[in-house]
Amino acid sequence: MPLYEHVFLARQDASTQQVEELTTQITGVIEGLGGKVVKMEAWGVRSLTYRMNKNRKAHFVLLNIDGPSAVVAEVERQERINEDVIRYLTVRVDEHEEGPSAMMRKADRDRDRDERGGGGFRGDREGGFRGDREGGGFRGDRGPRRPRDDAPAATEE
């Protein structure tokens, strides 16, 4: 049977429980038509690149599906009807990716960075070379403006 990756975005004001129920409903449709959900990943609430239907964030869910094309057609029809689904995309793939998806690996990498204490206070900025400023302090006033040589002066009539 053909393999598909299916991602749908649910409205941000839908609770996590509602998104799980929606995912369960979609999984039921897939299995009812002879398909199989190989993997399901909930990526959580993420910011959208641009506003969609007045939403700036959405719940992202990935489903790896093994089933006939009729399954995909019915899932997309159900999502078109459902008001909680903002967008969906189904792509046919040659084989499913083993292990966590790229989005989950990125989330793990970000979590590891937070645990290491990345960001935060990086020390004093005093000292170091600051060009013409002694000790890296305040530059002081600029001084008076010098006259312009390249433009003719405006004449009053």
From Swiss-Prot:
UniProt KW keywords: Ribonucleoprotein, Ribosomal protein, RNA-binding, rRNA-binding
Pfam hit, one: Ribosomal_S6
One GO biological process term: translation
NCBIfam families: S6
Molecular function per GO: small ribosomal subunit rRNA binding; structural constituent of ribosome
GO cellular component terms, semicolon-separated: cytosolic small ribosomal subunit
SUPFAM superfamilies per the UniProt record, alphabetical: Ribosomal protein S6 (SSF54995)
PANTHER family xref list: MITOCHONDRIAL 28S RIBOSOMAL PROTEIN S6, SMALL RIBOSOMAL SUBUNIT PROTEIN BS6M
Protein function: Binds together with bS18 to 16S ribosomal RNA.
Protein name from the UniProt record: Small ribosomal subunit protein bS6
Location of region: Disordered: 96-157
Species annotation: Rhodopseudomonas palustris (strain BisA53)
Basic and acidic residues composition bias: residue spans: 96-151
Homology family: Belongs to the bacterial ribosomal protein bS6 family.
